[in-house]
Amino acid sequence: MKENRITRLMKQDKKLLLAYYMPEFPVPGATLPVLEALQENGADIIELGMPYSDPIGDGPVIQDAAHKAISHGVTVRSILDLVKQARAGEGCKKITTPILLMGYSNPLIAYGGDCFMADAVEAGVDGLLIPDLPPEESEDFLERARSFGLTVVYLISPVTPPDRIELIDCMSTDFSYCLAVNATTGTGKLDTAGMDEQIAEYLKRVRKHAKKKFVVGFGIKDRERVRKMWELADGAVVGSALLQQVASAKTPEETAAMAAEFWQSLR
């Protein structure tokens, strides 16, 4: 089996910058140009959101993006088709950056677990992050994903106890994903001055109990915050801030240009 792109990336000694993007936001046709813009400007991994009508952990920015994506006809199947086009260089430069799909379990169950994984691998997906599927309840899912060569990522939060950090670290294929605050994504309520010390202690605790790499997300909006997170973790994830930057775009080309300019500002 060909080595997974994420597995290969995690062997490198570098700090990572991950992008989260909701397909076809804010306008239809934006996905492929945005993927190209993110790749050209140094995104190490691209997370593509799979929109769901009832997200439990998403803030207003991602909820709005998800609703618009759904209104633009985005489905799990259409996302896989877009990934396949991106990998083939159809409609954009050939995308070689690792792609991680992030979304809730219900659409995947409706699609059919093994069918979804087979189609995802065929399309060129490298990994999955399913927030509402805890590791304690996902041994079969994890085994199936690994049999297809897919990386699986699990979430750690500031209240995760040490023994569970070790479990999540063990079950995550290549890396785990740390939420920087106990809040929904993209709320803009991160008091960075007051939270820095708590986040630092939390990530030091994760470092103590995790053997694999971990990235941190939620509330990262600029170069200063990216570098702060790089001091404490192996990577930083920027999602809601990216969606906010491109939200006013009227065309796919404008969306890509806005994404490129913003991503350059983070490096």
UniProtKB/Swiss-Prot annotation:
Database matches in Pfam families: Trp_syntA (PF00290)
Pathway: Amino-acid biosynthesis; L-tryptophan biosynthesis; L-tryptophan from chorismate: step 5/5
GO molecular function: tryptophan synthase activity
Active site location: 47, 58
Gene Ontology CC terms, in alphabetical order: cytosol
Catalyzed chemical reaction(s): (1S,2R)-1-C-(indol-3-yl)glycerol 3-phosphate + L-serine = D-glyceraldehyde 3-phosphate + L-tryptophan + H2O
Keyword Isomerase: no
Domain of life of the native organism: Bacteria
Enzyme Commission code(s) on record: 4.2.1.20
Coiled coil listed as a keyword: no
Keyword entries, A-Z: Amino-acid biosynthesis, Aromatic amino acid biosynthesis, Lyase, Tryptophan biosynthesis
Protein family per UniProt: Belongs to the TrpA family.
UniProt cross-references to HAMAP family, sorted A to Z: Trp_synth_alpha
PANTHER family: TRYPTOPHAN SYNTHASE ALPHA CHAIN, CHLOROPLASTIC, TRYPTOPHAN SYNTHASE, ALPHA CHAIN
Assembly and oligomerization: Tetramer of two alpha and two beta chains.
Task performed by this protein: The alpha subunit is responsible for the aldol cleavage of indoleglycerol phosphate to indole and glyceraldehyde 3-phosphate.
Record protein name field: Tryptophan synthase alpha chain
